[in-house]
Amino acid sequence: MFKMVSSPHTHSGKLTARIMLWVILAMMPAFFTQIYYFGFGVLLQSALAIGTAIIAEFIAIKLRGKKPLNYLSDFSVALTALILAMAIPPYAPYWVIIIGTLCAVLLGKQVYGGLGQNPFNPAMIGYVILLISFPLQMTTWMPPINLLQEPPTFSDAFSLIFSGLTTDGFTLSQLTHNIDGITQATPLDSAKIFYKSHNQLSDFYELIKLPIFMGNGTDFAQGWWQINVAFLAGGIFLILKRIIHWQIPVAMLVTFFCLATATAFTGFTHLSAISQLVSGAMMFGAFFIATDPVTASITPRGKIIFGALVGLFVYLIRYHGNYPDGVAFAILLSNICVPLIDHYTRPRVSGYPTKGRK
């Protein structure tokens, strides 16, 4: 007897759990790079997020009268939690990641029926809710720890997240008192803030002299471009393993690069297109978030259109909006368009007459 089950169904012999584990593995280079440059807060936020996500998913599935272990074993909720944890500031208060994870799991996934039913990327739902609700906590980034006179230890990181103070009683601001205050933002934040008050090309050289951009005098936006390169390497690995398709990340990056390059010819406005590609969450979003098989387009042409749309939205938000990054908003806005994209890009069924022919 065959047992009939509802969608989503697994194809190509790849179990969902195996795919999720491959994606998590591909994120590890960026994960450890982020720890190297920004400290143990990344590790603690990830542990908090994964623990909260598992508990929330367990309760939600239990309330629906199903067996939680059958769903938790696919590791999808762990991946969602890890993506969210790596997207927020490493030393944000503990309640930020807990609230964000609950929103991601419950409002972004379970409210629609679970894995395969959600129209929006759950991690980005949680991230956007946090960004809108707690802008101060979500935009206060510690500079790379090698710029600090006293980098926080594991105990300091734990204490900062849960009490706001290190074990010696210092706040995050006090730890960075010897560095220009603008370094508590990301390079994209710094560039946008600086540009609003300086619009001359000569002023740009003053911007890149700031510690967050030059550090020891050789690194551009140190920490950030290394993390983006690590995400790029992990993304290429997933493409080679056929876990994700190349169309979405390539279309997204090429679209953004072309628009950013064209803008550069109109006059000095922002960082170069290359600098934009290795700053913020560009590579993270292109290879690990936009490629979510549940919320992205499923047709070959649709993937290209979807990726290009994400790249367009990122460009519009970064260059003409108030948010310096915009990857999360771009992906959610593009998720809205997926049903329409898939409808008009469905491959013609063999033997089915084309439009206008009988």
Curated annotation (Swiss-Prot):
The modification FMN phosphoryl threonine is found at T186. Its cofactor is FMN. The keyword Phosphoprotein applies. It is found in: Cell inner membrane. GO terms for cellular component: plasma membrane. It is a multi-pass membrane protein. The chain crosses the membrane at residues 19-39, 41-61, 79-99, 125-145, 220-240, 248-268, 271-291, 297-317, 321-341. One of its GO terms (biological process) is transmembrane transport. Its main location: membrane. InterPro entries: NqrB/RnfD, RnfD_bac. Pfam families: NQR2_RnfD_RnfE (PF03116). Its EC number is 7.-.-.-. Keywords: Cell inner membrane, Cell membrane, Electron transport, Flavoprotein, FMN, Membrane, Phosphoprotein, Translocase, Transmembrane, Transmembrane helix, Transport. The keyword Transmembrane applies. Part of a membrane-bound complex that couples electron transfer with translocation of ions across the membrane. Belongs to the NqrB/RnfD family. The complex is composed of six subunits: RnfA, RnfB, RnfC, RnfD, RnfE and RnfG. NCBIfam families: PRK00816.1, rnfD. This is Ion-translocating oxidoreductase complex subunit D. It comes from Haemophilus influenzae (strain PittEE). The gene is rnfD.
